[in-house]
Amino acid sequence: DGIGFVRNLKEHGVDVKGKKMVVLGAGGAATAIQVQCALDGAESISIFNPKDPFFARAESTAEKLSKETPDCKVSVFDLADEAKLKEEVANADILVNATLAGMKPHEELTLIKDKSMFRPDLVVADVVYNPAQTRMVKEAKEAGCKLAIGGKGMLLWQGAAAYKLYTGLEMPTAEYQKFQEENENK
């Protein structure tokens, strides 16, 4: 997940190196993204998660990353603290939804309740790929964010990384992308 996420950003002209990030979520995909972005040189990662069993996991991830990647400041906050979320997003370069919010059959859900958090220089990325554009991505585009992308690219690039790992060969990604484009609205 982490490799696919970072590659998807790179394919859209965004490098995480030196960037301030806000990541919503602390599950498996979120943790992989946090770790990969820290390893790839993100300046800071602010993790927001509800005070559920995954919150302790987020705190553990932050502690480990602080030791392994001391140049990346990792902090954990309660998702219920909307003022802190707004503050952190205001200072972020990249906002990531790494939760199930917005995934079918709950397309109406978004964790960003205040659309004023979106601004033109903010990159918004979602791991959800069904639907191709979540409510968060749509609202970010409407607000004029320079880049707002769904999770299909992450899915492609994590698959390509796994394909190479298992076969030693490059996955024919152009063929897959063409197939996706042809079947997007079917």
Residue ranges of predicted features:
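Glycine/small-residue-rich loop that forms an oxyanion/phosphate-binding "nest" at active or ligand-binding sites
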Residues: 1-19
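Residues at the starts of beta-strands that form the adenosine-phosphate
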Residues: 20, 43-44, 73
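Rossmann-fold NAD(P)-dependent oxidoreductase module
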Residues: 8, 32-36, 139
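Rossmann-like adenosine-cofactor binding region
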Residues: 71-148
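Glycine-rich adenosine-cofactor-binding loop
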Residues: 2, 18-38, 49
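Short, flexible coil/linker segments at domain boundaries that flank nucleotide/cofactor-interacting
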Residues: 15-18, 40, 118-119
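NAD(P)-binding Rossmann-fold cofactor-contacting core
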Residues: 40-69
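Adenosine-phosphate binding glycine-rich loop
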Residues: 18, 121-123, 127-186
